[in-house]
Amino acid sequence: MWLTACSLIVTRAAHLAGPRNRGKAVGQVMLGLSVANVLGVPAAAWLGETFGWRSAFAIVVVIGIATVVALIRVLPTLTGMKTTDPLTELGALKRSQVWFTLVIGTVGFGGMFAFYTYLNSALTTDTRLSVSVVPFALMLYGLGMVTGNFVGGYVADRSVAVAILGGLTATALSLGAFAVLAENAWAALILTYLVALTGSMMLPALQTRLMDVAADAQTLAAALNHSALNIANAAGALLGGVVVSAGYGYLAPSVVGVMLAVAGIAVTVVALATARHQPVGS
């Protein structure tokens, strides 16, 4: 249900913003998700510890109801959007550029998730940070995601291709630098922020590209983007676990992330080259 709601929100926000501001609109929606992670997770943990685990779920219900009421009251009537149906939406699965974009997201973000899954262990084992400092590092990661969505939206409005390729390249460089410099505490903290920033700046661009290449099937395409990110989460954690289990240490997932980001660049280049020889919506 959450994926369905989010895909609807993204497509409606992009429509309201207009062609020149779609990236910023999508980025602002994704920005909300990042802020929810930064503030919601620790808040829920505090509520659970203080008032019991049921209190966190109760707050979610209250916030959800308040959000629905707010949408009913302030969301303008949407005009000019094409109506669609399930068969039309499923047509997105026939378009090669939709699949290319989903693969870019899966592979590119896989490296970011490989890094994040083992970040706690890397900071305490290799950087030798105190356990009490790790929450601050995770907060930096969350702030990086917030900044990345904000920056990525502006870049996507100017060039979706630049936002994707630039984000993947910067992510590869940041992950590589972390693998080399993580023994220095200041470098590790700064790079933790940069990995999150560079990775997250791709999100608005990928979502915008999916809406472009999906033609009349934008809602399903938007939902599939979140599915691709969930696959990236699982695959990144799995690949990171493989290299850690093989004895390469907790910095090895960052190297895996570099490889996946480079693979994402390769897929992006192929997708862009192929798109030049295909009709719109193929």
Region locations from a protein language model:
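Juxtamembrane intracellular "pre-TM" segments in multi-pass secondary transporters
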Residues: V74-I104
